[in-house]
Regions:
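Ubiquitin-like/PB1-type beta-grasp interaction modules and other compact soluble beta-rich domains
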Residues: 1-83
Length: 83
């Protein structure tokens, strides 16, 4: 099955080619996709572990099962502003 990966912030700068359609096995979960990205060293593990994931523009739990055509956004931690 194919899902659309969307990267933001530093992820887009580090791995612009990863912001594309991705082949996954049927029944893959958000956690499985993140594990795959860590194994492939596509994105920095420390930053990846601190990030949120949205599927079809809604925050997703690691157990969420992905389906054909889902849009998966990897959202890095946000910082900045004034105390």
């Amino acid at each position: 099955m194919r899902v659309r990966m969307r990267l933001f912030g530093p992820f887009k700068e580090i791995a612009p080619a990863a912001d594309a359609w991705r082949e996954l096995r049927e029944g893959e979960t958000v956690a499985g996709l993140l594990a795959l990205l860590r194994r492939e060293a596509v994105l920095p593990e420390k930053l990846l572990l601190a990030s949120a994931v949205a599927v079809n523009q809604e925050y997703a739990q690691p157990t969420r099962i992905l389906v054909e055509g889902d849009e998966v956004a990897i959202l890095p931690p946000v910082s900045g502003g004034r105390p």
